Amino acid sequence: MTHFIKGQWQAGKGHDVTSSNPANSEIIWRGQTATAEQVNAAVDAAREAQFDWFMLGFDGRLKIVEAYRSQLEANKAELAETIAQETGKPQWETATEVAAMIGKIGLSATAYNKRTGTEANDTPAGRAVLRHKPHGVVAVFGPYNFPGHLPNGHIVPALLAGNTVVFKPSELTPKVAELMVSLWEKAGLPAGVINLVQGEVDTGKALASHPQLDGLFFTGSSRTGHLLHQQYAGHPGKILALEMGGNNPLIIKGVADIKAAVHDILQSAYISSGQRCTCARRLYVEQGEQGDALVAKLVEAVKQIKVGPWNAQPQPFMGSMISEAAAKGMVAAQANLQNLGGVSLVELSHLQAGTGLVSPGLIDVTAVGELPDEEYFGPLLQLVRYSDFDQAIKLANQTRYGLSAGILADSRDDYEYFLARIRAGIVNWNKQITGASGAAPFGGVGASGNHRASAFYAADYCAYPVASVEADAVSLPASLSPGLSLE
C-alpha cells in the first residue's frame, strides 16, 4: 500500500506511478498518487494526534523514537539495499546513510535538550522559566539523493519536539519512504503522529498550500525552495525551513602532498555521483608548476574512478545517477560549458542508454568569461586556474549560493584569510567539502537556504520558546506603584 494515514496503509486515489532502479531500469515499486482529499485526511490525522503526542512528554516521545532506532538497527541491511536499488548508489555508500540515520537519534535528543530544553532561574521578579513548545503539524518534503537520512533529519527532531508530521518524499524514491514509515509503525508510534503521502507535483502543491500546516521543512532544489518561500510570504505564523543547493568552490593553495589533495578533490566532487548539495562544483588551482602537477595527477585519478551498478563487485566509487534524464542533463551541461569555451580534460559520458550511469567529467573553464552560476547536480567539476589568491576568493564568492566552500592549504594563515572572506555556511580546511558533522549545524546562506540551519540546529525550527515569570501564590509587592491605592 502506498500511503500511511491515521495509522492505516491505503492505496492512492490518484494516477499510477512507478519507481525504477536507475542502474538497469527495472521497476521496483508501483503505486498511485495521493489526491488532495487524501492529503487533507493526512493533515487532519496529524492535527488530531498532535496534542496527545505533545502531552506524552519528552521522555515518553524519546522512548518511541529510540524504539525506531532499534528498528533501523534490526532492518539496516534491507534499508541500505532498498536505498541502493532506488537511487543507484553503491551498497557501501547506502550502508553509511543508514548508519547516519541511526546516529541521528542520539544527536537529536542531545540537540533538543541543549537548544530547546527547559531552564529556570530565580529572579527578584519571580521565577523565570524558559520552555519550548512544538509548532503543531509540520510537512516534511524529502529529496532523492539521501532519501533516508535527510528527511530523517527533519522528522526525528520534529517528533521529539512534540510535532506531528506529514511526510511527502521525492517521487523518485517512494519505496525507501514506505519502508521508513513502516519502521515507525513497528516502533509503536501512535496513529496520526506520522503520515505518508506519495505523489508528484500536484500532491506536493496540495500539501504545501494546506491551510492547517504550522510549518514546512524542505530539502531540495533552489528553484522549488524559492517557490515555497514566495508561497509562504505573508504567513508569519508558519515556520519554513529550506535546505537547498550550492555552486560550491574549492581552492587549492600551496599543498605539498599532491596525492592527498587529489583524494580530497575526488571526495568533494564525485562522491554520490556528484549528487550531494555540498559537492564541489568549481575548483580553483594555482597557475605554475605545482598547479600543473596537481592537475595532471587529478586528470589521471578522475579517469581511474570506477563506475558501476549499485551491486557491482568489487564495489564502484560512483553508482548511477538518479535517472537517465539526470544523466542526459549532465551531458547537456558539459556541452554548454564547451560552447562557452571550456575545454574537457576528462569527458563526461553517458555510459549506457536507459540508465543513469555516467563517467565523471573535468572541464577547464578558465577561458570562460562569465561562468554560469548554476548548480550542475552531477559528477562534472569545473577547473579554473588562478594567479592571485584574492582573485581566487573573489571568483569563489561570485555565486548567489552559499552552502559549502573549502580550501586545501598547508598554511593556517591562508585558511584564516580565506575563512574571513568566503561566504558560506560550511567552510572546511584540508577536508573534503562534502564532509559535515551531525553535531554541528548544517545549512547555507543566499540561495542555499533561509537561515534555518538543520542537523544539530534542526531543534531550533522544530519548537518555539515560551518565556514565563512564575510565583507559587499571588502576593502584594513590598510597595505599590505611585498613584495606586488598594485601601
Curated annotation (Swiss-Prot):
Region (Disordered): 1-23
Matching PROSITE patterns: ALDEHYDE_DEHYDR_CYS, ALDEHYDE_DEHYDR_GLU
EC number per UniProt: 1.2.1.71
Pathway listed: Amino-acid degradation; L-arginine degradation via AST pathway; L-glutamate and succinate from L-arginine: step 4/5
Binding site for NAD(+): G220, S221, S222, R223, T224, G225
Keyword NAD: yes
Domain of life: Bacteria
Catalyzed reactions per annotation: N-succinyl-L-glutamate 5-semialdehyde + NAD(+) + H2O = N-succinyl-L-glutamate + NADH + 2 H(+)
NAD keyword on record: yes
Entry's Gene Ontology BP terms: arginine catabolic process to glutamate; arginine catabolic process to succinate
InterPro entries, alphabetized: Ald_DH/histidinol_DH, Ald_DH_C, Ald_DH_CS_CYS, Ald_DH_CS_GLU, Ald_DH_N, Aldehyde_DH_dom, SuccinylGlu_semiald_DH_AstD
Active site annotation, chain numbering: E243, C277
Keywords: Arginine metabolism, NAD, Oxidoreductase
CDD domains for this protein: ALDH_SGSD_AstD
GO molecular function terms listed in the Swiss-Prot or TrEMBL record: succinylglutamate-semialdehyde dehydrogenase activity
Function: Catalyzes the NAD-dependent reduction of succinylglutamate semialdehyde into succinylglutamate.
Xref: HAMAP family: Aldedh_AstD
Sequence similarity: Belongs to the aldehyde dehydrogenase family. AstD subfamily.
Name of the protein in its database record: N-succinylglutamate 5-semialdehyde dehydrogenase
Organism expressing this protein natively: Shewanella sp. (strain ANA-3)
